[in-house]
Amino acid sequence: MTTQIPVPPVVSDQALPDRISDRLKGQIIVILDFGSQYSELIARRIRETEVYSEVLSYRTTAQQLREIKPKGIILSGGPNSVYDQGAPECDPEIFQLGVPVLGVCYGMQLMVKQLGGRVERAKRGEYGKASLHIDDPTDLLTNVENDSTMWMSHGDSCVDLPTGFEILAHTDNTPCAAIADHQKALFGVQFHPEVVHSVGGIALIRNFVYHICHCEPTWTTAAFIEESIREVRSQVGDRRVLLALSGGVDSSTLAFLLHRAIGDNLTCMFIDQGFMRKGEPERLVELFDHQFHIPVQYVNARDRFLKQLEGVTDPEEKRRLIGHEFIQVFEEESNRLGPFDYLAQGTLYPDVIESADSNVDPKTGERVAVKIKSHHNVGGLPKNLRFKLVEPLRKLFKDEVRKLGRSIGLPEEIVRRHPFPGPGLAIRIIGEVTSERLNILRDADFIVRDEISKRGIYHDYWQAFAVLLPIRSVGVMGDKRTYAHPVVLRFITSEDGMTADWARVPYDILEAISNRIVNEVKGVNRVVYDITSKPPGTIEWE
């Protein structure tokens, strides 16, 4: 008996077309998600071609799609087998809309099954790289080279195709690797063209988007800026908006965009909890307040946060206490500076996909904030702070936010800033956080960033930082015995932070960093290098 894999959670289907602006209706590729780990990646690949795409629930009906008016529909992969009991299925009327459809892996098998074909457990599954042998190089496979490497991940196989379908390509183990019903514009691929391992995948996606769906390149940064400013002004009017500025690319880009849209009706609040990197709070205020003339309400809460962490060693308790204190400070300061009608959040599109638990005001239909965005790692705001939300970035992926930031004048030091956890250095100090330990780690971390920055390799790494351990080791300095802290260096390469590999940093660079730390940072006499990937480890130590 086949073990049933739970179907993906249902994305709210209420008023789906209302989420899409008039400009994008009729120029959108919809991805119906069946629980694939790559659904977001498909959307990103399509957007890279300057065509808008959205990920919707597989339960989205044909009627709802008619209202959205997509130029094309993609059925994602998924963890199920189409013959599993309760396996997710789409509305079969979708295939009668006259809109081009591309099924990917599970999506192809589902299309075959729903249109009268047959899918069976493959005699031999196919996982990893495979050579694609092209039988028909037209339409979907135009400009895809024969014997291109494609990424396979399937245990089932299509054995009988529905009427009207033909085989476009095969692999050594999969007779039906790409199929098409040209008359109805229905296509399927057993591989994943969206992943980086699929060499001809981008060409295939462009073929579907432009040659089959006949899309136009309307998803541009300039068009997004113009539309966002118009939407923010329409939503907010002359009312006041509060933004909690963190210094990261999301909140900084949001601040620039909102200030361009509503000017002085935006209030940026920066709560300095004392756990940022060396010089960052001062630099943030200087950039926004003095250089770009976007006023920032600076709140020095360092002592309050540090007091909350006295004697605390558990990492989850640290996060909880930091989050709780952030809420207290935020509430006090918003009451002092307010009143405000709106809370601006740097919610991104992956957050929208992952969570459909937004609260809706029954009178206005607007989403109401009961939480501060999870990237702050601070938990929820009190329910009596009933701000309405303004979220101009909620259609964007992280890489699109960076492009937007550059376009509106955000400096590169923020646009390409390494990801930094909400609790900051507090979770890079293993054990209790004290003022002394913060100073040690802040100095060590500065040396790491300084050495790779002056060599011009800062952007070669997803993250590069130091971790302070709560132990001591014996050393010898100046013919004297020392007993001081070891520091861990953590250098990571990654595309999105979901998986990561430890970076092969040249020894001479590691040596230079180590020498500076043990000579310049009082309280450290040993430096070690973390060579753990994610998985099994995580990027951060806590």
Curated annotation (Swiss-Prot):
GO MF annotations, alphabetized: ATP binding; GMP synthase activity
Positions of the GMPS ATP-PPase domain: 219-417
Keyword Mitochondrion on entry: no
Biological or metabolic pathway of the protein: Purine metabolism; GMP biosynthesis; GMP from XMP (L-Gln route): step 1/1
Active site: 105, 192, 194
GO biological process, one term: GMP biosynthetic process
Keywords: ATP-binding, Glutamine amidotransferase, GMP biosynthesis, Ligase, Nucleotide-binding, Purine biosynthesis
EC number per UniProt: 6.3.5.2
Example of a GO cellular component annotation carried by this entry: cytosol
Keyword tRNA processing: no
Location of the Glutamine amidotransferase type-1 domain: 28-218
Binding site residues for ATP: 246-252
Reaction(s) the record says it catalyses: XMP + L-glutamine + ATP + H2O = GMP + L-glutamate + AMP + diphosphate + 2 H(+)
Classification via InterPro entries: Class_I_gatase-like (IPR029062), GATASE (IPR017926), GMP_synth_C (IPR001674), GMP_synth_GATase (IPR004739), GMP_synthase (IPR022955), GMPS_ATP_PPase_dom (IPR025777), Rossmann-like_a/b/a_fold (IPR014729)
Enzyme class: ligase
NCBIfam families: guaA_Cterm, guaA_Nterm, PRK00074.1
Subunit architecture: Homodimer.
Function (record text): Catalyzes the synthesis of GMP from XMP.
Name of the protein in question: GMP synthase [glutamine-hydrolyzing]
Lineage of source species: Bacteria, Bacillati, Cyanobacteriota, Cyanophyceae, Synechococcales
Gene symbol of the encoding locus: guaA
